[in-house]
Amino acid sequence: YSEEDLIEIIEFAKSINFEFASYMSASKFYKDYALKTNDKSKYLEDYNQHVAIVALYLADGNKEQAKQFILAMIEQRYQPATPTFLNAGRARRGELVSCFLLEVDDSLNSINFIDSTAKQLSKIGGGVAINLSKLRARGEAIKGIKGVAKGVLPVAKALEGGFSYADQLGQRPGAGAVYLNIFHYDVEEFLDTKKVNADEDLRLSTISTGLIVPSKFFDLAKEGKDFYMFAPHTVKQEYGVTLDDIDIEKYYDELVANPNVLKKKKDAREMLNMIAQTQLQSGYPYLMFKDNANKVHANSNIGQIK
């Protein structure tokens, strides 16, 4: 852009009348989005100026396109995602994308790597969801010694602390979610972390939780049957495939019948009630319907959604 272009675009943005719809919306903008001095004692821009800077960045040198973006944002016809609206056009900024998906393998090296990666992504303003379904369950064996695995909860707690610590320069808090397959042995403990009366040492108070739910679970609930939760490490030992990657529709009955696979059972409808009660108390867990997502997966040739 030339200097004349910049002046013209800024004046165009200032000429459009904008009023916040509520005190809450004005407070949200000036608290979380407006550029401030380093000591945060003064604001350096108003809403129209902020929109102009975002539009200039997105238009990438196209003056008329920048004006169209400004008009669309001020008229509330278009709203960029939070990281884009916060960071576009700034020299000292995070990334412009919203979400990152990670997966933990069943090893301490992987746990440490994902913990570090999640902090780095949180630092640049990303929301991070992490699949914990490959981790061995509480009480499983490590190097043949039974009863020593700690399960998924300590990992979830460590990640929660990381997201609280690594925010975006105090401008935007870290946001993370941990997901677990509903057939995982630790799923009941995982649900308990969001109950209002959960022990503070176990409660996940700031990180979000979600369940990955294959259609097989709903089939069992519909038929009024028990469903089994399996210890992932014993599944991997028997079949060479992780619980998260195995075709549960195909192998479920075989897993139930295999005496070498550690498992426990619960009425499927009771589990649905448990999920509903936890959601009523906390709003969690999120539910990801795995098979439905994969039926309409546009990039199924690359791999499955899990």
What kind of region is each of these model predictions?
Residues Y1-K306:
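Extended catalytic cores of very large enzyme megasubunits
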